[in-house]
Design a protein with these regions (language model features):
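Anion-binding alpha/beta catalytic cores of soluble intermediary-metabolism enzymes, centered on
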Residues: 1-254
Length: 254
């Protein structure tokens, strides 16, 4: 077809088209706009994986972050050439290269001191710095980066273990959880905890609720919360329904 109106704002026009085609939700657009206003340093763990490298390049092109890709320089450059990707503006960090020895040693010293009471030694910590998840999360922990993306080569359970060791849980909490965001025609729903705590007691549910409330507000939504179990109206006097009842009662009183 032929456009009947002059297009003055091409960015807004592209957003409108993406919405019409179902490629972008209001929440996604808000996140992109926020990220563009203040792009952060994001570490992409598996730089040698095509999907991870494509994501880093696309994120740079969209202006939503300053990508830092972990991996072997030659391998990543070869892959980029095969995929016809430009690495301009992409920082590559080869964590195993001798040039990174000083940083590995600094990270190992910080981690071993942090976990000394758990029996961690400098030698063990230094060995871990050759692993991308430990190295990348130490970048975040020390302020060398702002966020870390991983998971293509490792199970989430292993990633969680490293995150607890390196970054840890906020002092006011004893538990943490994961959240999935569901975009539907009726609106956006935040679901937690979807992966971590299999049989949460009331204390765990309270922590999950507080963390969820904080996260939902971060996304500029007003939280209206519901807790689900397998029993209604006190029909079951033990198990998760009791935990849910205790957690809801606490949240209402506090």
């Amino acid at each position: 077809g032929v456009a009947r109106k002059n297009i003055e704002d091409w960015d807004a026009y592209c957003v409108q088209l993406r919405e019409l085609m179902g490629y972008e939700s209001k929440l996604t657009r808000q996140l992109y706009d926020t990220a563009r206003r203040n792009p952060q340093r994001v570490v992409f763990a598996e730089g040698s994986h095509p999907n991870m490298l494509k994501a880093a390049v696309e994120a740079k092109a969209e202006g939503i972050c300053h990508p830092i890709v972990l991996g072997n320089d030659e391998t990543i450059e070869k892959l980029a050439k095969e995929l016809d990707l430009s690495l301009e503006g992409i920082e590559i960090v080869n964590l195993r290269h001798p040039n990174e020895a000083a940083r590995r040693e600094r990270y190992a010293r910080i981690l071993s001191e942090k976990r000394a009471r758990q029996g961690a030694t400098y030698e063990e910590a230094n060995d871990k710095m050759f692993e991308r998840n430990y190295f990348g999360m130490m970048m975040v922990e020390t302020g060398d980066a702002d966020a870390f993306i991983t998971g293509l080569y490792t199970k989430y359970s292993n990633t969680i273990k490293v995150a607890k060791e390196v970054i840890g849980i906020q002092p006011q909490y004893k538990h943490f959880g994961t959240m999935h965001i569901l975009n539907s025609k009726k609106g956006t729903y935040f679901l937690a905890d979807t992966l971590i705590n299999r049989h949460p007691n009331a204390e765990t549910l309270i922590d999950i609720a507080k963390l969820s409330e904080h996260t939902v507000r971060f996304f500029n939504h007003t939280p209206v919360m519901a807790m689900l179990s397998y029993s209604n109206f006190g029909a079951d006097t033990e198990g998760s329904p009791v935990s849910v009842h205790e957690a809801v009662e606490y949240m209402q009183q506090n």
